[in-house]
Structure formats: structure tokens, C-alpha cells
């Protein structure tokens, strides 16, 4: 069905097509949806039905949680959400590079605020594994950034299976500086301290996950993993989008500012994943994302060290059948 809809959707502005597709999910007939039977994965104290989940960014406010759940994901990650709602960057801010199965976005953490997301999650019927991705508001300076993350962490704790700290988006000014040295260590120290309090308050432990950039040096990644191990962070998502344009040079829209995702990100993000595996071994769960649009690319992520996978851009180009193709293919291995 998606193969019939895609040419029509691709005639629309990318952000309008994105919104329309999410709306249409609510009206698809029941036979279109399926439950995937895969190989369970035990990670971060959770049992994932299979390896393929949805990356953050598709449903920022949790408005489409039940509809997305019917596509067969093992887990769904919502967000990025910030303490206060914000409009994000001016439009247009989402661009397809169809020739390369790629997307450039400079959305800028547009969302309705953490309170709206929590209410949407509470009203949904979804009972599966739920990640919630948290960030800081644009106007919050770096010295106060930890306050934004702590605020969101407290708000979402009782509604999340795990919480992702997004400090790697290229579309919020200076955000990636939070991956550096003292900023990073102080942020994780405060979140770990709060995690202990919240676990006692709610009677359950919710793992923290860090989403990293593919554009950092090997040395920076090593420093980050040392801090991640020091503070008992249980997962790393590798990776966010890249600022590099080497893989799409001279293609339409390639000069647009923002983060590049999709097939051209595959090699860079997988290299990062492989390095992270060397640095953390089996002490931290690695979630591979970036360029997965086939069974082959999914296998490459797993071979590089990923225990779990997330898709987003591949879903835009291949449709929900991508989930089935990967899960059934991995089952056959």
C-alpha cells in the first residue's frame, strides 16, 4: 500500500507529507497492521520483543502512539521533548534527497512541551516499551541546560521504559557542546543522582540512554564513553544526524543546513557504533540507527555491535514493510 502512496506523498512538501502520513495511520484498515514475532532481546533490564524500534523525531508529542504501535515496532521512542513548547526553526526545515534515500532536517526541537507529551502518553492504550527523548529549550543557556533535562526527566520518569538524553542534535545552537568534558560529566552526574531518587519514589528503575553525534572525533567518543561508564548509563544510541555533506555533494538540497540522515549516514554512523563497541564492550547496550533501510544494513549494524536497531528515514523511503523485512530476515539467520 505504501508503494502506491509514496509517489503522491513525495509531491508534497516534506513536512506536510510527514504530518499527512501520521494522520493517515489512524485510518488504515486493521488488516494492514501486524504483530511481529521476532527474537526477544534482553537489554537494560527490559525485554524487547525483537530488535527493530522507531527512532525519535517521527512523533514528537506522542499524538500517534497507538497508530504507530500497530506497525509492529519492538519499541517506540517519542520526542525530542523540552520543558516548554517551542515552534522550532522557520519553515521550510525538512528536505528530501530522494536520489540518495536521504533527508536533511533543521526542525529545532519543535514540540508542544513535556506536559502535553505526558498527557498524550497517559491517554494512549500502548503498553509496549516506550522511550522518551528529552532535550533543552533553545533559549536555555548551557550553564542551565541540566535544569531542563532534570525537569523533563522528572516529568516523564513514571511513563517511560527508558529515557534518552539528546545532546547531539545539530539544530539547536551549541547543544553539541554538552557532549564535551565538564558539561557532559556534570549533566550525567546530576541525572544519575536524580535517577536514584526517582527510582525510590516510583519503585522502579528507568534506564538512561545517551544519543551521540557521528561527527565527534575518536578521542571525544572515548572521553564520552569513559564518563558514560563512570555514571552507569545503560545505553547509547549511535547515532544522531550528521553535518557532513561529503556523501551527497552536488545533489539537490544538499546545501541546506541541518542534520543529514538516511542511507548516506550509514557508513559514518556504523563506524561510530563499531568504535563505541570497542570502548564499552558489553557494559552498555548499543542501539544502532542511521541509514538502516534494508535487511543488509540492519545486519551491518548488528555486526558492528548493536543489540537493538531504530529506523526513521528508511521508513520514509521504504514504508512499514521495512520493519517486517528486517525482523523476518533476522529470524531466518
UniProtKB/Swiss-Prot annotation:
Its EC number is 1.3.5.2. Pathway: Pyrimidine metabolism; UMP biosynthesis via de novo pathway; orotate from (S)-dihydroorotate (quinone route): step 1/1. The active site is at residue 169. It comes from the Bacteria. Keywords: Cell membrane, Flavoprotein, FMN, Membrane, Oxidoreductase, Pyrimidine biosynthesis. GO terms for cellular component: cytoplasm; plasma membrane. It is found in: Cell membrane. Its cofactor is FMN. Gene3D superfamilies: Aldolase class I. GO terms for biological process: 'de novo' pyrimidine nucleobase biosynthetic process; 'de novo' UMP biosynthetic process. Binds 1 FMN per subunit. It catalyses: (S)-dihydroorotate + a quinone = orotate + a quinol. FMN binds at residues 56-60, 80, 133, 166, 211, 239, 262, 291, 312-313. InterPro entries: Aldolase_TIM, DHO_dehydrogenase, Dihydroorotate_DH_1_2, Dihydroorotate_DH_2, Dihydroorotate_DH_cat, Dihydroorotate_DH_CS. Pfam families: DHO_dh. Substrate binds at residues 60, 105-109, 166, 171, 240-241. One of its GO terms (molecular function) is dihydroorotate dehydrogenase (quinone) activity. It is a peripheral membrane protein. Monomer. HAMAP family: DHO_dh_type2 (MF_00225). Catalyzes the conversion of dihydroorotate to orotate with quinone as electron acceptor. NCBIfam families: PRK05286.1-1, PRK05286.1-2, PRK05286.1-4, PRK05286.2-5, pyrD_sub2. This is Dihydroorotate dehydrogenase (quinone). It comes from Legionella pneumophila (strain Lens). The lineage of its organism: Bacteria, Pseudomonadati, Pseudomonadota, Gammaproteobacteria, Legionellales. The gene is pyrD.
Amino acid at each position: 500500500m505504501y508503494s502506491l502512496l509514496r509517489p503522491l506523498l513525495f509531491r508534497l512538501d516534506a513536512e506536510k507529507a510527514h504530518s499527512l502520513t501520521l494522520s493517515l495511520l489512524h485510518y488504515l484498515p486493521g488488516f494492514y497492521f501486524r504483530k511481529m514475532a521476532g527474537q526477544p532481546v534482553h537489554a537494560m533490564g527490559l525485554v524487547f520483543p525483537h530488535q527493530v524500534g522507531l527512532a525519535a523525531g517521527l512523533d514528537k508529542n506522542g499524538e500517534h502512539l497507538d497508530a504507530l504501535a500497530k506497525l509492529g515496532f519492538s519499541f517506540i521512542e517519542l520526542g525530542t521533548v523540552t520543558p516548554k513548547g517551542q515552534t522550532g526553526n522557520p519553515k521550510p526545515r525538512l528536505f528530501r534527497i530522494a536520489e540518495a534515500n536521504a533527508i536533511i532536517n533543521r526542525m529545532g526541537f519543535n514540540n508542544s512541551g513535556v506536559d502535553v507529551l505526558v498527557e498524550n502518553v497517559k491517554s494512549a492504550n500502548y503498553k509496549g516499551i516506550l522511550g522518551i527523548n528529552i532535550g533543552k529549550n533553545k533559549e536555555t543557556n548551557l550553564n542551565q541546560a541540566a535544569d531542563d533535562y532534570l525537569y523533563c526527566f522528572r516529568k516523564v520518569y513514571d511513563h517511560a521504559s527508558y529515557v534518552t538524553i539528546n545532546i547531539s542534535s545539530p539544530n539547536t545552537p551549541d547543544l553539541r557542546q554538552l557532549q564535551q568534558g565538564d558539561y557532559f560529566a556534570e549533566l550525567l552526574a546530576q541525572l544519575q543522582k536524580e535517577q536514584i531518587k526517582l527510582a525510590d519514589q516510583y519503585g522502579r528503575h528507568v534506564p538512561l540512554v545517551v544519543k551521540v553525534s557521528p561527527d565527534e572525533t575518536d578521542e571525544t567518543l572515548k572521553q564520552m564513553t569513559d564518563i558514560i561508564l563512570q555514571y552507569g548509563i545503560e545505553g547509547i544510541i549511535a547515532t544522531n544526524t550528521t553535518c557532513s555533506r561529503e556523501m551527497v555533494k552536488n545533489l539537490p538540497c544538499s546545501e541546506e543546513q541541518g542534520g543529514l540522515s538516511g542511507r548516506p549516514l550509514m557508513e559514518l554512523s556504523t563506524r561510530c557504533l563499531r568504535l563505541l563497541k570497542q570502548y564499552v564492550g558489553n557494559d552498555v547496550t548499543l542501539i544502532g540507527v542511521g541509514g538502516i533501510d534494508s535487511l543488509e544494513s540492519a545486519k551491518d549494524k548488528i555486526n558492528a555491535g548493536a543489540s537493538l536497531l531504530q529506523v526513521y528515514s528508511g521508513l520514509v523511503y521504504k514504508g512499514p514493510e521495512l520493519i517486517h523485512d528486517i525482523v523476518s530476515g533476522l529470524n531466518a539467520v
